[in-house]
Amino acid sequence: MEGLGGNVPSNQCRNFLSPSAFGAHHNSLSSGPAYTVGDRTHSVISESAKQCSPCPAPTSPPNPAISYGYHFGSSYYSCRNVGIQQTGLKSGAHASLAGYPVDKYMDVSSLTNTPVPTDEVSARAKEFAFYQSYPNPYQRVSGYLDVPVVPTISGHGEPRHEALISMEGYQPWTFANSWNGQVYCPKDQTQTPHFWKSPLSGDVMHNQTDINIYRRGRKKRVPYTKTQLKELEREYATNKFITKEKRRRISTATNLTERQVTIWFQNRRVKEKKVVSKVKENIP
């Protein structure tokens, strides 16, 4: 403006600077004394600074209550009870977070320190952790194989009480298309033909087999020959009770043991008593 003071006449300066900018009427400017361009510019700036008042701050509508949530897959999980307040959206109207509009779901600019219920947070954390990775319902123990407790139809019929079996003799084979990525196969298939082998030795098992045979029932009865029965009847007719020397002699003659001879004499006396008792009952 100062450079234009020497060449521009006063009437053109009046037309260049509008009367409204000086805050005075047009009549006063036309009737007043003439000023140079430099003086008039200084006065205009001072008067404009006095008359301009600070612009009021733009008022914005009260922030509406928003809800917090997160997207997983094609579903949206809302957390309405969580204490989150919106203090002002700093981002633009089309701001987005992970492909979803920010102004629709949550305000990432500032969050208040409102306490959140512990049950709600723990429940949401567990749910998100479950849907995020889809883990197994339980973790397998390395080095052990699960065996069902229920007995099989083709088994021996006794229940298996061992729930875990050591797999020290097994090595993993990896497969690309399998779920777990590896299966266990025995190193040597001809180690033990019977998986459930008893720790007892062979002699002990043999003795137990003999004991079980005796427990099943009486030993098979061996009938006496006619020669043996004739010799026993002859000695019984002589004496119903046998002595030690006589028992040895009969055992040698009949090729029977002394115990067999003794038992035969006992049974013979019982049989005679029965016969005598029947005869007495028949006699009137």
Swiss-Prot record:
Highest taxon in the source lineage: Eukaryota
InterPro entries, per the entry: AP_axis_regulatory_Homeobox, HD, Homeobox_CS, Homeodomain-like_sf, HoxA13_N
Location(s) in or outside the cell: Nucleus
Gene3D superfamilies (UniProt xref): Homeodomain-like
UniProt keyword terms in alphabetical order: Developmental protein, DNA-binding, Homeobox, Nucleus, Transcription, Transcription regulation
Biological process annotations from GO: positive regulation of transcription by RNA polymerase II
PROSITE patterns hit by this protein: HOMEOBOX_1, HOMEOBOX_2
Single annotated GO MF: DNA-binding transcription activator activity, RNA polymerase II-specific
Chief site of localization: nucleus
DNA-binding region range list: 217-276
GO cellular component: nucleus
PANTHER family tied to this protein: HOMEOBOX PROTEIN HOX-D13, SEGMENTATION PROTEIN FUSHI TARAZU-LIKE PROTEIN
Family per record: Belongs to the Abd-B homeobox family.
Role description: Sequence-specific transcription factor that binds gene promoters and activates their transcription. Part of a developmental regulatory system that provides cells with specific positional identities on the anterior-posterior axis.
Protein name per its UniProtKB record: Homeobox protein Hox-D13
Gene giving rise to this polypeptide: HOXD13
